[in-house]
Regions:
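A short acidic, often aromatic-flanked loop/helix-cap motif at beta-alpha or helix-coil junctions
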Residues: 59-65, 107-112
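Hydrophobic, Leu/Ile/Phe/Ala-enriched alpha-helical segments that form helix-helix packing faces
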Residues: 20, 24, 28, 90, ...
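Conserved strand-to-helix beginnings and helix N-cap segments that scaffold or border functional pockets
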Residues: 14-18, 88, 114-115
Length: 126
């Protein structure tokens, strides 16, 4: 399962994904910057239960998704709370894909609560 976690530049979302990784007990989780992940996506998906890609919200559009073949694997996009204003425009840009877009809870993101974030991500997948 591939999930994209994004913020303005990717720095904070990267730290957040690393907190999710630390909080995981049973899940095999892999964390990687979205551009780097494109080079070995198939291996990461095969070897892990959850692949968390992180980066900037601004780069996500149809062309980017297709370039890396993410349309076949991306299960969800999670926007940092400060990027919530992009949700509607992102939905329009990605309307040809069936990728749900969620907003990360402000308290969860602010506290860098990896345990709660992992629970939220997994619950949204059910």
């Amino acid at each position: 399962m591939l999930v994209y976690v994004c913020c303005a530049t990717g720095n904070t979302s990267g730290m957040f994904c690393k907190q999710i990784l630390k909080a995981s007990c049973r899940e095999q989780i892999y964390v990687e910057e979205i551009h780097e992940l494109g080079n070995h996506l198939e291996d990461a998906l095969r070897e892990n239960d959850l692949v968390l890609a992180y980066g900037s919200a601004e780069i996500i559009d149809e062309k980017f998704i297709r370039r890396y073949h993410f349309e076949y694997h991306m299960q969800a996009i999670w926007l940092a709370p400060q990027m919530r204003y992009l949700k509607d425009s992102m939905k329009k840009k990605l309307n040809c894909f069936d990728i749900p877009i969620h907003i990360i809870d402000m308290k969860t993101f602010g506290k860098m609560d990896g345990k709660q974030a992992l629970q939220d991500i997994l619950n949204a997948m059910i």
